[in-house]
């Protein structure tokens, strides 16, 4: 539970306060921004992707718990857990790619690496959307007390599934990520209350 809450906070602070690249800019401009401010870039990447990976592993554990409990939603939860683990691996790859952008020997190489990371990022948004939709569905089907969070997770999942078609720098993507954070905090709070 706490891992979800800490992950959300770390991700927000990392991406907003430290990460120097603006997702609304062209790939070459984003790569140049990372290379121009290495310290801020490293801190932003560690906090941003670190928080995201923490959230993904925590959500994977929640999904596994729902799956283990059995019931109507267990099959959806199993797929969600698998997807969250894949997305966490993709986030690690993106972290490595953007670290490589900072240390690239040429601007052209940095732009190529940045473009690859952004492409994987679009796929991750789709994956998070599908996994969150499935987790929300499994929560609703198990009827285990936090149905509002389950319903909200379904809405967030749908928003994130359509977000990549609009681009990473659009309001709908921002809305999806904000919703994902809120849903994750809701799941985290319920997990903490359940463990007490």
State where each predicted segment sits:
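Hydrophobic, aromatic-enriched alpha-helical segments typical of multi-pass transmembrane helices
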Residues: 1-196
């Amino acid at each position: 539970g706490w891992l979800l809450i800490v992950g959300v906070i770390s991700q927000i602070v990392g991406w907003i306060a430290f990460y120097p690249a603006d997702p609304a800019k062209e790939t070459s401009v984003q790569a140049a921004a990372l290379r121009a401010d290495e310290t801020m870039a490293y801190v932003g990447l560690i906090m941003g992707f670190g928080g995201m990976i923490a959230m993904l592993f925590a959500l994977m554990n929640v999904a596994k718990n729902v799956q283990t409990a059995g019931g109507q939603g267990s099959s959806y939860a199993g797929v969600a857990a698998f997807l969250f683990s894949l997305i966490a691996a993709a986030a690690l790859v993106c972290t490595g790619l953007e670290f490589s952008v900072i240390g690239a020997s040429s601007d052209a190489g940095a732009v190529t690496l940045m473009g690859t990371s952004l492409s994987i990022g679009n796929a991750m948004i789709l994956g998070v959307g599908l996994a969150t939709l499935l987790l929300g569905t499994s929560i609703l089907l198990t009827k285990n007390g936090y149905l509002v969070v389950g319903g909200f997770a379904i809405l967030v999942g749908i928003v994130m599934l359509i977000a990549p078609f609009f681009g990473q720098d659009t309001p709908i993507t921002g809305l999806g990520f904000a919703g994902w954070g809120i849903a994750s905090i809701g799941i985290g709070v319920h997990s903490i209350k359940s463990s007490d």
